[in-house]
Amino acid sequence: MPPFLITLFLFHSCCLRANGHLREGMTLLKTEFALHLYQSVAACRNETNFVISPAGVSLPLEILQFGAEGSTGQQLADALGYTVHDKRVKDFLHAVYATLPTSSQGTEMELACSLFVQVGTPLSPCFVEHVSWWANSSLEPADLSEPNSTAIQTSEGASRETAGGGPSEGPGGWPWEQVSAAFAQLVLVSTMSFQGTWRKRFSSTDTQILPFTCAYGLVLQVPMMHQTTEVNYGQFQDTAGHQVGVLELPYLGSAVSLFLVLPRDKDTPLSHIEPHLTASTIHLWTTSLRRARMDVFLPRFRIQNQFNLKSILNSWGVTDLFDPLKANLKGISGQDGFYVSEAIHKAKIEVLEEGTKASGATALLLLKRSRIPIFKADRPFIYFLREPNTGITVFFDRIQIIYQCLSSNKGSFVHYPLKNKHSF
């Protein structure tokens, strides 16, 4: 039986920006990839919540490009929209990744990759050079026949600490525990993490229990954060005539922002908005916002889910990679036989603020007296985490329902402990 390649993408969250035509072109391509991934997941998830990290999915695919040849490499390039074999693209992405890790004024962002190699497996010197140069990567020997390898467990340890339970979290266990590694020769683990404090923090004393109308019309009482603040806001119309409000919530000491997209018509489902999202639309929204003083209401939420990326990539035309007879990954070791067995993406995201104590009476009085415009995410909405300097989308997610069991207090910050393992 030929050896196969297992790739894990271990996650948390992140983002980036640059200059000139190359920057603009790559920003659009990265955004198109993010939207393609989002729309593919949305199409099969119907009216449920989900969280994905486009940046975390694209990074390991880029590394695989260094070892892919022939139609295998072409299919990866078609899926990503670019190839790292283009020197301009390679240099641009390297410069972008070189800005990470970063830590300043309460914001922490880190991107890294580890390539665990079965002891005795020969690797192409050229592939080793590329991987070592790419996105803070490293090569480490490991016994991949043992899923509980010390090296891999160490790499996963930090993200496991924030694992939690809940109705929206999906199946338990991590992909590495669910995939046979008996014939694995390589394991690629990419980790991306983001933790940021709001530039203008939500006060726990302003958190209220307010109604949230779910996708199917069910109304739930949920903890709703609130603040009156200066924000970037805009109202737009998509190509089908649907109107949306777009709000930007920035993080302290960082260019990273959370963008929320809320249909103006309460009867417009997200499924009517999603097919009309394009990279140009996202660019217009994020660059055309204007300062406004608003009452902002945002629910606390937590999502964890797992996807089979293999089926999604197959639907995009990436098929050779998973076929032991067709996969051409000779650039990895110069040998035939490597192929990707599985591609599993697992992610978790939490948006929390300190305290759960409601202050409904005060809020009602505030709203009755205030003429300040209101942005109230009390129904299904789309949101994405983005670093405007490079336009890279770290998360692209959807909220359709807020579960009532969210009672944990973890301070007045937004935490994205993304545990994504894509097991190839």
UniProtKB/Swiss-Prot annotation:
Residues bearing carbohydrate: 46
Keyword line: Glycoprotein, Protease inhibitor, Secreted, Serine protease inhibitor, Signal
Bias kind Polar residues: ranges: 146-157
Biased composition (Gly residues): 163-173
Signal sequence interval, chain numbering: 1-20
Region (Disordered): 143-174
Name of this protein: Serpin E3
